[in-house]
Amino acid sequence: MTLNSRPDRGFPVIFKHQNLIADTEITKLFKEKKMSFNVGHTTFGFTMRVPDAEATAVDELIASHAAWMRDTHSVIEEEGKLHTLEYYVSKASELNDMMDPSKGTTGQVIYTVSEVHKDDEHFGKHVELGQSWDRINEFFGLFEKYSPLVTMSGRVTAKL
């Protein structure tokens, strides 16, 4: 599958097996995949600082978590998966001076893991489901080792 820009429409065109998917299917796909969370939805997230030398191991664990999330969760209603409104991970080198990147980095990487769930009940199901992930103890080990700032059962308070 390839993804090409459609500047005339403001969204990509998806080619599947070299055949163009009908515009109505594309529109439906984008409506389903767009960020569908709102103020009041339940959130979980954490931000942590990791030494550069340890980032590769953290990258691998987070990639495993993301794969588990893809296997067990979906941003659209999908049979056999927990409907989760949003999941993403961001990563950046920590700057010595965020107003002047030319001053270099601290030798730390900042990771942010963000999830948005429909409500507290769905978040609870996510926590329960997480117990079945074979690397959950390693994941919790991140909390012990890096002392992240954590938002547990937070609420979306603003969005575009």
Protein language model features and the residues they cover:
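Short S/T/G/P-rich N-terminal loop/turn motif that feeds into the first structured element of a domain
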Residues: 6, 10-112, 116-129, 145-160
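N-terminal soluble domains immediately following signal/targeting peptides that reside
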Residues: 108, 134-136
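Loop-helix junctions at membrane interfaces
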Residues: 141-142
